[in-house]
């Protein structure tokens, strides 16, 4: 989500989110004047907060109350106000060292079973983040690619079909890439191009694990077909990972008691639906946290942040889910994540998840 804010609006949104995260109370201009050096009057802050409310970034839970961040407000906070600072400051490094130290101190890889080790890692992650922690068991035996085919269904629409070694079939409908659809090429030309790209996919991916698809080097595709490569890169990986969930998914879950102390979880029914998701619908949750983001360097962890209604699973649409994959040789093995209220310390949670994923990647290498 891209919203252009002035420097003043950015500072006031940042302060509002920080204050609400710390207090769980609606934020008024007086509190911001007292707690933050914003260099403007209370009246100016009120005016700016009004503008942010009209933009959908803040809202008032009650007419007489202060304002709280919306999901969109948190999204701007994460994408524009804190993510750059995480790259430029030492806070992420400090948290990463804390995670690594705790994992090294408490986990003995030579002596314990893998399940016990990951349970211990999940407990450490929950303690450091104050959230529900989620760690999936590594997927070492997954289906492999038998065949990939692109075909034109109708003008401007194509279908990607994936057949696994066990003859399971998965498909995805897509529009043609803009670079091709705008020129309105002859359908026979499109059919030939799709076959060439299909041949490329099969020559490079047949027999490989579904989890290895994200490592495909699309630059080897002929230059004249690069528009397909740029367009299909995420779609092929997404379809493969959607198809890769094993018959039995196992997720280590820790920290439920800690996060349920938060005021957002005071309603018994909401707590019950979250517990039901964690206990009875692990395959859906596995697919969600194991979804692969696009990576420039497949040996590094990239963190995915889903805020509130961005989560497709209904029980957690009032929560934030932060996740990343751990890898071996660039191939994803499993996932690490934390789940908490939308009012959570995103800086710490993002850094902790990234550090845990990097540590597990090194441990499995």
Swiss-Prot record:
UniProt keyword terms in alphabetical order: Repressor, Stress response, Transcription, Transcription regulation
Gene3D superfamilies in the record: 3.30.450.40, Heat-inducible transcription repressor hrca homolog, domain 3 (3.30.390.60), Winged helix-like DNA-binding domain superfamily/Winged helix DNA-binding domain (1.10.10.10)
Residue ranges the record marks as coiled coil: none
GO MF term list: DNA binding
Signal peptide, first to last residue: none
InterPro entries: GAF-like_dom_sf (IPR029016), HrcA (IPR002571), HrcA_C (IPR021153), WH-like_DNA-bd_sf (IPR036388), WH_DNA-bd_sf (IPR036390), WHTH_transcript_rep_HrcA_IDD (IPR023120)
Gene Ontology biological-process annotations: negative regulation of DNA-templated transcription
Domain of life: Bacteria
NCBIfam families in the record: hrcA (TIGR00331)
Function summary: Negative regulator of class I heat shock genes (grpE-dnaK-dnaJ and groELS operons). Prevents heat-shock induction of these operons.
Family the entry assigns: Belongs to the HrcA family.
Protein name: Heat-inducible transcription repressor HrcA
């Amino acid at each position: 989500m891209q919203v252009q804010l002035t420097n003043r609006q950015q500072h006031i949104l940042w302060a509002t989110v920080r204050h609400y995260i710390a207090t769980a109370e609606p934020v008024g201009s007086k509190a911001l004047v007292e707690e933050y050096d914003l260099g403007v009057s209370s009246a100016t802050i009120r005016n700016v907060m009004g503008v942010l409310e009209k933009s959908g970034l803040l809202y008032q839970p009650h007419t007489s109350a202060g304002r709280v961040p919306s999901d969109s407000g948190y999204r701007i906070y994460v994408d524009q106000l804190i993510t750059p600072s995480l790259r430029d400051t030492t806070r992420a490094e400090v948290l990463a060292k804390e995670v690594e130290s705790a994992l090294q101190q408490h986990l003995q890889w030579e002596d314990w079973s893998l399940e016990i080790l990951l349970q211990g890692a999940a407990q450490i992650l929950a303690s450091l983040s104050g959230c529900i922690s989620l760690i999936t068991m590594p997927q070492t035996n997954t289906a492999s690619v038998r065949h990939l085919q692109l075909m034109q269904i109708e003008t401007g629409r194509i279908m990607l079909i994936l057949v696994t070694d066990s003859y399971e079939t998965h498909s995805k409908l897509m529009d043609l890439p803009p670079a091709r659809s705008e020129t309105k090429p002859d359908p026979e030309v499109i059919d030939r191009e799709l076959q060439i790209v299909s041949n490329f996919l099969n020559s490079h991916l047949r027999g490989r694990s579904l989890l290895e698809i994200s490592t495909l080097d699309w630059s080897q595709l002929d230059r004249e077909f690069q528009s397909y490569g740029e367009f299909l890169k995420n779609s092929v990986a997404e379809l493969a990972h959607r198809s890769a969930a094993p018959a039995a998914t196992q997720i280590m879950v820790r920290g439920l008691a800690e996060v349920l102390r938060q005021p957002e979880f005071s309603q018994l029914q909401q707590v019950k639906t979250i517990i039901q998701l964690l206990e009875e619908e692990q395959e859906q949750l596995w697919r969600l946290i194991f979804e692969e983001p696009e990576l420039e360097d497949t040996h590094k962890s990239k963190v995915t942040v889903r805020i509130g209604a961005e989560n497709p699973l209904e029980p957690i649409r009032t929560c934030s889910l932060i996740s990343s994959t751990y890898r071996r040789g660039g191939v994803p093995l499993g996932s690490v994540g934390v789940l908490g209220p939308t009012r959570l310390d995103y800086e710490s949670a993002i850094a902790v998840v990234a550090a845990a994923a990097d540590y597990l990647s090194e441990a499995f290498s």
